[in-house]
Amino acid sequence: MEKLQEYLEIDRSWQQEFLYPLFFQEYIYTLAHDHGLNRSILYESAENLGYDNKSSSLIVKRFINRMYQQNHFIISTNGNSSNQKKFLEHNKNFDLKMISEGFAVIVEIPFSLRLVSSLEEKELVKSRNLRSIHSIFSFLEDKLSHLNYVSDILIPHPIHPEILVQALRIWVQDAPSLHLLRFFLYEYHNWNSLITPKKSIYIFSKENQRFFLFLYNFHVYKCESIFLFLRKQSSHLRSTSFGALLERTHFYGKREHLVVLFHNDFQTTLCLVKDPFIHYVRYQAKSFMASRGTPLMMNKWKYYLVNFWQSYFYFWSQPGRIDINQLSNYSFDLLGYLSSVRLNFSVVRSQMLENSFLIDIAINKFDTIVPIIPLIGSLAKAKFCNALGHPISKPVWTASSDFDIIDRFGRICKNISHYHSGSSKKKSLYRIKYILRLSCARTLARKHKSTVRAFLKRLGSELLEEFFTEEEEVLSLIFPRASSPLRRLYRERVWYLDIICINDLVNLD
């Protein structure tokens, strides 16, 4: 972002809301390669054409020169015209890919600059490690003791391209840029299928992930705007810690009594209290909204959201895409965890003068459990075990050295432990570690043409044990076991901000 601001200080065209001239600037395509989600088509296409990486700058300059040639670069919106067919031939596909990469950077400029100015006004410190996905951690840490319903919501889709263009007009007021965006979206909409037999016209693919992720996130942003409004309206108890406070369990009983007694005199004051408190989180295309209320009120919320999306944003959604369930009888997958609410019973002793009472109190506890069966299925797909979870050797890795084999198994084991460190029950991870440890031993034994028992007896099992417990020993140095409060902290859930960088097991083959 700092590098982009340096370039924009020189090029003032964006300050007059003119983004289209930026398509003719070489640094835009350089930035598209530097922080792209995937490998840039600048270098990939250069390799296909026989150039090295140093020639990519020359390719960009030639591409910009071709854009200046009005007769050479013709865009036709007619899907059946001969001009468009010629435009989408092999020689023109590279140009279209280049524009899509540049557009992905250019269209983010108004949003990025507004974000920076907003942070400066609020005097907030920017953190490069924080992402929107990290907001899920606060949702999983909440006890949800005061909520009783959860709505499983699917983000409405598909969306017509023209609606998305009209929505972007609020932020991007440059008409030529909007026309170019409209062309891209209609091309995508007309083709229907992105994967074609001919690789030469495989335009809107993973190479353009950044471009389409921006459009998708903007679409989700419009859908979520109503939840942000509701969150602000239901702001009572928002500043209170979400700990399992006993007084919290009786709050709603007191509130209902308050409404009955002072309904006529304090109607305006009670509006803030009567609003339902909600807790909202989104992961990928699904979102969850936990709230408190009756089944009738939750159904009203469902149809309100459907009508609101259709009336104001023209998003066609169906009531069946919003599933309402009781929180106590529902479990859902979120960020690789199986989350559910269970009752946690506790006994409180109350002393009144000479009499004492034992009070049983049931409080909701939000558990995040490792889904052991899907995780074993992933290990079986990666050929670390069979479908039943029995460890097997990895013949493909036997050509590597012993150190490389142990290192690859160790990285997978540490990644799984690292990713699922936020689980409230870590005992299920022991089975995963056992599968990987025994699979590593069998792979080494297969390489040396020996049995697992003979191999471990010859080298000793301490090597594997020390390697797989390295992370736990590091944590034990940070949180000494001698201290009781720190020992409890050692057992608590830990959320790492870099879990989004951990690769899938299948990609480690």
From Swiss-Prot:
It is found in: Plastid, Chloroplast. One of its GO terms (molecular function) is RNA binding. One of its GO terms (cellular component) is chloroplast. InterPro entries: Domain_X, Maturase_MatK, Maturase_MatK_N. It comes from the Eukaryota. The keyword Plastid applies. GO terms for biological process: mRNA processing; RNA splicing; tRNA processing. Keywords: Chloroplast, mRNA processing, Plastid, RNA-binding, tRNA processing. Usually encoded in the trnK tRNA gene intron. Probably assists in splicing its own and other chloroplast group II introns. Belongs to the intron maturase 2 family. MatK subfamily. This is Maturase K. It comes from Macadamia integrifolia. The gene is matK.
